[in-house]
């Protein structure tokens, strides 16, 4: 439900803001969304016992340079009791901007570190596929094989040792 509401707000922002304003709003929303990872902060922000004006002040205080539209957005979200959608809105705005600019970020997970040249080759191949620019980064989580994710366009390519081993066993059993 939050994602659907966030899409509407993101669409409105995309239509009414300049690129510079969008960048400032996205940066501020991403920073606020990071606060939501702390359950105490999230509980405070979604609490009906806390005055809306107090929530607005706390959320707006660090972002004096984010612009009028950001201030209006936070006030509107507070007024409509929708501050809890900020993480979804930050994510949706990031996706919408990436789709508009045709610039996508992705992550490569593997049990070994890939060279910059290897990452670049994979990114170039994916860039042709999505008709845009793909920038890949090495993920920090180890993976039994290799996995490439570009979430904004829904790409997930994976080759794992366990999956290949399972397919080999299935093929051997079929051949018998």
UniProtKB/Swiss-Prot annotation:
It is found in: Cell inner membrane. It holds the Pfam family OSCP. It is a peripheral membrane protein. It comes from the Bacteria. GO terms for cellular component: plasma membrane; proton-transporting ATP synthase complex. GO terms for molecular function: proton-transporting ATP synthase activity, rotational mechanism. The keyword DNA-binding does not apply. SUPFAM superfamilies: N-terminal domain of the delta subunit of the F1F0-ATP synthase. Keywords: ATP synthesis, Cell inner membrane, Cell membrane, CF(1), Hydrogen ion transport, Ion transport, Membrane, Transport. HAMAP family: ATP_synth_delta_bact. PANTHER family: ATP SYNTHASE DELTA CHAIN (PTHR11910). F-type ATPases have 2 components, F(1) - the catalytic core - and F(0) - the membrane proton channel. F(1) has five subunits: alpha(3), beta(3), gamma(1), delta(1), epsilon(1). F(0) has three main subunits: a(1), b(2) and c(10-14). The alpha and beta chains form an alternating ring which encloses part of the gamma chain. F(1) is attached to F(0) by a central stalk formed by the gamma and epsilon chains, while a peripheral stalk is formed by the delta and b chains. F(1)F(0) ATP synthase produces ATP from ADP in the presence of a proton or sodium gradient. F-type ATPases consist of two structural domains, F(1) containing the extramembraneous catalytic core and F(0) containing the membrane proton channel, linked together by a central stalk and a peripheral stalk. During catalysis, ATP synthesis in the catalytic domain of F(1) is coupled via a rotary mechanism of the central stalk subunits to proton translocation. Belongs to the ATPase delta chain family. This is ATP synthase subunit delta. It comes from Nitratiruptor sp. (strain SB155-2). The gene is atpH.
